[in-house]
Every structure is written in structure tokens, then in C-alpha cells.
Regions:
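Non-catalytic terminal extensions that flank enzyme cores
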Residues: 1-202
């Protein structure tokens, strides 16, 4: 039995990456859906949700979650979360996507369809407010502030299905490990405490 603490939120890991027949079917369906390009940060966030690294998130945050994280580092359900995980687009694209629609999420740099999402909410945000609350500055020299200020003016929220992890497993081989794989390794070694290091920037 594992001696490790439970995943964030106290439940099981929630990797959103599809596999097998479900993956093949969703890839086929995604090809015909309206497409939204993701920034590098949004693509990274999608990959993290795909492998379960952002457990227990099931998709990009709603307005109430965004507001709660900005103002008190907590989602609407009270779960601690320090930085919003959001998907943005411009006003024109936002107007053309209806709440309830399914969309394909595309890596803006490679054109690869990385996932799909059912849009449950569209909302505008105050970027300066987000920057001040999360980063305590609106200085564009701050990398986090720069990313927020350059994103679209409309956020799209909803549950996602992840179709790809961007080829990282192929590129990095055994160095690429999912949360499930690392937890299995730690358990096999009998570890109960693990020191982790997170770099300042993604």
C-alpha cells in the first residue's frame, strides 16, 4: 500500500488523456470541429491536465473559478489553486462560438489538434486585476504578466478531452513520466516523502 499523500483534492488522479478506441474516435470527430488556437502556456496546461498533473481539474476554469483563484487562491469549491488555468480567444472568435458547442483545441505553434472541449461558459476578464492579484504587479517585464496581457479578451470554459501530450514522451523517453508513473515508482521504493523542485518559469 502506498505511503504517499493523496493527489491534490484528496481523490484519485484524473488524467484526461484518451487512449485506444476512444482516442481514435475523438481524433476523427475533432477534425470537423471549429478550431481554437492555444498559446504555448495553454498548450502546456492542456498537457498537464492530460497526464493528471493538474488533478482534479477537468478542463479550463469557469468565471467563478477564475475569480476565486484571483481573489483568494481558491476555486469555487474551496480547493486551493494559486494561478488561473484558462483558455482565451479574441472577441470575434468568441462571438462565433456558442455555449454548448464542441471545439477542437489546436497547438498554435504546430497546428496539431491536442484536444476537444465542450464550451460551458464564455466570459471577459480584467487582465490587470488578474496580474495584480496573482503576480502583484502589472509590469510587462514580468513573464507571467506578459503572458496574461497578451492573451485574448474572452475566456472559454468547459471540460476537455486530451488527444496528445505533444510528443514529449517520444522526445524524452524514460525522462518523461506522468504523475501515475512517478507515484508508482515512489511506492515501489517505499518512499513516503518526496522533495520536488519547480522551476520559476514553464
Amino acid at each position: 500500500m502506498s505511503k504517499l499523500v493523496r493527489p491534490h483534492g484528496g481523490g484519485e488522479l484524473k488524467p484526461l488523456l484518451l487512449t485506444g478506441d476512444a482516442l481514435a474516435a475523438e481524433k476523427t470527430r475533432a477534425a470537423s470541429l471549429p478550431k481554437i488556437k492555444m498559446s504555448s502556456r495553454e498548450t502546456g496546461d492542456l498537457i498537464m491536465m492530460g497526464i493528471g498533473g493538474f488533478t482534479p481539474l477537468e478542463g479550463f476554469m469557469t468565471h467563478s473559478d477564475w475569480q476565486g483563484v484571483c481573489d483568494g487562491y481558491k476555486m469555487a469549491n474551496g480547493l486551493f489553486w494559486p494561478i488561473p488555468v484558462t483558455l482565451s480567444t479574441d472577441e470575434v472568435a468568441g462571438q462565433n462560438i456558442a455555449v454548448g458547442a464542441d471545439i477542437a483545441l489546436v497547438n498554435g505553434e504546430t497546428g496539431e489538434i491536442m484536444g476537444t472541449m465542450k464550451v460551458t461558459e464564455k466570459y471577459a476578464i480584467d487582465k490587470a486585476h488578474e496580474c495584480m492579484q496573482v503576480y502583484k504587479t502589472t509590469d510587462l517585464e514580468h513573464p507571467g504578466v506578459k503572458l496574461v496581457m497578451e492573451q485574448g479578451d474572452v475566456n472559454l470554459a468547459g471540460p476537455i478531452r486530451v488527444l496528445s501530450t505533444g510528443g514529449f514522451a517520444d522526445r524524452y523517453g524514460a525522462l518523461f513520466m506522468t504523475p501515475a508513473q512517478t507515484r508508482a515508482l515512489f511506492t515501489s521504493l517505499g518512499w513516503s516523502r518526496v522533495a520536488a523542485f519547480q522551476t520559476r518559469n514553464p
